[in-house]
Amino acid sequence: MAKLRITQIRSGIGGTSNQRATLRTLGLRKINATTVRDDRPEIRGMIRTVTHLVRVEEVDS
C-alpha cells in the first residue's frame, strides 16, 4: 500500500477548531513535524481539510 509523508508547514493557530483537531488526529503538533500514513480515503479527506497547512509527498512503502 502506498504511503504519504505529511509535514506541517504552517501553524494551526487562527484556524477553525475542526482544522486544529484534524492536525492533531494526523499526529501533527508543531511546525515541521512529519508523519507517515497509509494512503487511504479517510486520510486524504483529513488532508483536504488542512491542505493549506501541510505538505504531502508520496513515499515508497
Curated annotation (Swiss-Prot):
Belongs to the universal ribosomal protein uL30 family. PANTHER family: LARGE RIBOSOMAL SUBUNIT PROTEIN UL30M, MITOCHONDRIAL RIBOSOMAL PROTEIN L30. SUPFAM superfamilies: Ribosomal protein L30p/L7e. It comes from the Bacteria. The keyword Ribosomal protein applies. The keyword Ribonucleoprotein applies. It comes from Frankia casuarinae (strain DSM 45818 / CECT 9043 / HFP020203 / CcI3). Keywords: Ribonucleoprotein, Ribosomal protein. One of its GO terms (molecular function) is structural constituent of ribosome. InterPro entries: Ribo_uL30_ferredoxin-like_sf (IPR036919), Ribosomal_uL30_bac-type (IPR005996), Ribosomal_uL30_ferredoxin-like (IPR016082). It holds the Pfam family Ribosomal_L30. This is Large ribosomal subunit protein uL30. GO terms for cellular component: cytosolic large ribosomal subunit. Disulfide bonds: none annotated. GO terms for biological process: translation. Part of the 50S ribosomal subunit.
